[in-house]
Structure formats: C-alpha cells, structure tokens
Amino acid sequence: MKLLVVGSGGREHAIAKKLLASKGVDQVFVAPGNDGMTLDGLDLVNIVVSEHSRLIAFAKENEISWAFIGPDDALAAGIVDDFNTAGLRAFGPTKAAAELEWSKDFAKEIMVKYNVPTAAYGTFSDFEKAKAYIEEQGAPIVVKADGLALGKGVVVAETVEQAVEAAQEMLLDNKFGDSGARVVIEEFLDGEEFSLFAFVNGDKFYIMPTAQDHKRAFDGDKGPNTGGMGAYAPVPHLPQSVVDTAVEMIVRPVLEGMVAEGRPYLGVLYVGLILTADGPKVIEFNSRFGDPETQIILPRLTSDFAQNIDDIMMGIEPYITWQKDGVTLGVVVASEGYPFDYEKGVPLPEKTDGDIITYYAGVKFSENSELLLSNGGRVYMLVTTEDSVKAGQDKIYTQLAQQDPTGLFYRNDIGSKAIRE
C-alpha cells in the first residue's frame, strides 16, 4: 500500500513516520514535506498543498490508496471534496464539516444549538458594535478572528483598551484579511486548558489520550501566542471523570449534530477545552490533528496506524490500542524572533542519539545537502516517552543543553504544570 500525506510540518512528519511503520505500507509520500523527513525514509513530492489538481494527478499516477490531510487551510479549501470527486479517498473532513474550525461563529452556533458548554459570546462585522459590546462586557475578554489565522488570531485582552485595539486591527486594519472580517468576542474562561482528540467517522468516534499544549512563546506562559512550543500526553492530573464528561457533553452531541446538519465528519477532531469551576467547556475546535500534540500522541499508539485509519474510513470497527503507562513529552525548538520576524539558514545541531525522536518542521538541506538549516518559525521537536513528566523533562533538556542550538530558542518549562499539580 502506498499513501500520501499532505502538509510540511512536524505534525505531518509524525503522521507519515507512523504510517510508514505500519505493516501493509510500502511507501509514504509527503507533499510538499520538508527535507528532514527524508532522514526517516519518507519520499517528498514537490507539490504545495493548494495545488489540488496536481496532488490528485500524482495520487492517480502513483496508485495511492488514500491521502491523509494535515493542514487546516487545505481542508478549508475543500481538498477532501476534490479528492472524493476525483474518485480518491482522503482522511479528513469535507469543507462543510471543516467549518467547525474555519468559522468560529459557525462552531459557536453548533454549540448553542446542541447545548454544548462554551463561553458566552457575540459575533460582529461592524467595529462600532464590537466596541460597544466590549465596553459593556468589560475585561478580561477574548477577541478572535472568525476565520483561519495560523493560530495567531486570538487575543486574550486584559483591558478594555486592548480588546478594542484587537477588534480594530481585525475589522478595520485588515490584519488577517478576510479571516478577520468578522470577530467572535467571548467571555474569558478561567481554568486549566487541555486537548482532546478523536478519530471520527460520522457519529462513530475513538478518543485518543489527553494532551496539554503550551501556546505562549516563553517560560511561565509569557509572551505572544504561537502555534505551540511543546506538549505532553496524557495529562496525569486530569481525572478520567472530566474526560468522560467532555466526551458525553461535548464530543458526542457535536458529532451527532454535524450528522443532523448534513455535514457528517470524517477525520481527526481536535477539541480545545478548559476545565472551569462549572466543568469542561469548549475553547475551540480544530478539524485536524494539532501541532505539536500529534508528535506526542502518535508515539503512544501501539496498534497499526494505517490499518486503523483504513478501517475507520471503511466504517469497520478499528482495533486501536494505546500505551498505558508513562508520559510522552516533547519540546519545540524555534527560530529566534518567532512568532514574528526571524532569520533562516541557521545550521541545526546533529541528530539526537538513542530513543529521543526528532520531528522536523521548518528545515531544508544546505546546497551541498550535508547540513540541515532552519527554514521556518518552528524548526524541530524532540520527543521522548518516560515514566514521568519529570523524567521526560530531564531527558529532553539534557539533550538540548548538549545541542546548544545557536540562533534558536525553546521553552524550559514544558510539562511543569503537571509537576506542580
């Protein structure tokens, strides 16, 4: 069996590597992928994610069994619809189902209609009305671009002035283009955040281990929001009862609701949750695997990944098993200046030894192909599975101290919340 993974980041590296380790898989192509993936025997295809017709032609020419779609923008652009129209299988939601992610207002409407707990909100395309709502509600308050904004379209405003400025940047200054033509303004929810993922086909779903991401750029959850600077799974201090509540009050009604709306969901559903004093509530949905959570969840999968996905797509009950013990922890290494302006072309340290996994993202080979260089904001991620969060931290941070990646930076406290609890 030959498979195609669409995307280029650390998430796609983790997906493709796990698929290649599956029994019936002979070859995994990644389009466009990144040069670091070739170190794990993955084959790169020089086609960008937006070129649906070229991807379809490649899949047909190379007799690809099915494609796994990684990035949100491809799903929002209807890549799964295009593959299906061409008679090809793709694991991911249609454009209509992926609206759970590409329109925050749509997601809110679904949650309200199907009684799913989430923050109170208002949606606005008019700046003056948004400003009046902010002033009426007070701070802290959250301002979100309605559409996709590379994980940068959310502002947690601590003052009314900050919130008004965020709304102005989105609605008047066109900061996020069409994605910010509407804003969703939400009440601020206080509590601990965690992520819940599920493999989904219609109203059938299969929950993965819980995970906790670290969005802020710097230690102590300081600095700007990023795509994610590290993660660990499972979340050891999160009671199973909370997960069960989230499944029954959030995941199940949303997926059954999507079927009722004529938008049945196929693919990976990410639910960003916060555990409040009133129980778990939804912060956001993503219509695909998270990055960096994929890189710490998939190493815990002990069943055959490709077979699992194939079964789910075929409507067959999959045999999915997960590692029961230990914790998987990963730290992202990013370019100095990320998530804003940063330099490219910084030489990467030597590949790690032993059982630490390296997932590559923003990298490319030097001209003589002897050296990997930085070529993006998030560059690579080191991942290990150990008996505890502390043991995982010790192993990764010892390795990073030895690498001493000049021109790059990382957080020193990934997983520390679990140790403090």
From Swiss-Prot:
Origin: domain of life: Bacteria
SMART domains per record: GARS_A (SM01209), GARS_C (SM01210)
Residue span(s) of domain ATP-grasp: 108-314
GO MF entry, a single one: phosphoribosylamine-glycine ligase activity
GO BP terms in the entry: 'de novo' IMP biosynthetic process; purine nucleobase biosynthetic process
Disulfide bond positions: none
Keywords assigned: ATP-binding, Ligase, Magnesium, Manganese, Metal-binding, Nucleotide-binding, Purine biosynthesis
Reaction(s) this enzyme catalyzes, per UniProt: 5-phospho-beta-D-ribosylamine + glycine + ATP = N(1)-(5-phospho-beta-D-ribosyl)glycinamide + ADP + phosphate + H(+)
Cofactor(s) this protein cannot do without: Mg(2+); Mn(2+)
Residues noted as binding Mg(2+) in the record, renumbered to the chain: 284, 286
Gene3D superfamilies hit by this protein: 3.40.50.20, ATP-grasp fold, A domain, ATP-grasp fold, B domain, Phosphoribosylglycinamide synthetase, C-terminal domain
EC id: 6.3.4.13
Keyword Magnesium: yes
Binding site for ATP: 134-195
InterPro entries hit by this protein: ATP-grasp, ATP_grasp_subdomain_1, PreATP-grasp_dom_sf, PRibGlycinamid_synth_ATP-grasp, PRibGlycinamide_synth, PRibGlycinamide_synth_C-dom, PRibGlycinamide_synth_C_sf, PRibGlycinamide_synth_CS
Pathways involved: Purine metabolism; IMP biosynthesis via de novo pathway; N(1)-(5-phospho-D-ribosyl)glycinamide from 5-phospho-alpha-D-ribose 1-diphosphate: step 2/2
Cofactor binding summary note: Binds 1 Mg(2+) or Mn(2+) ion per subunit.
Family: Belongs to the GARS family.
Annotated NCBIfam families: purD
HAMAP family per the UniProt record, alphabetical: GARS (MF_00138)
Protein name: Phosphoribosylamine--glycine ligase
Lineage, broadest ranks: Bacteria, Bacillati, Bacillota, Bacilli, Lactobacillales
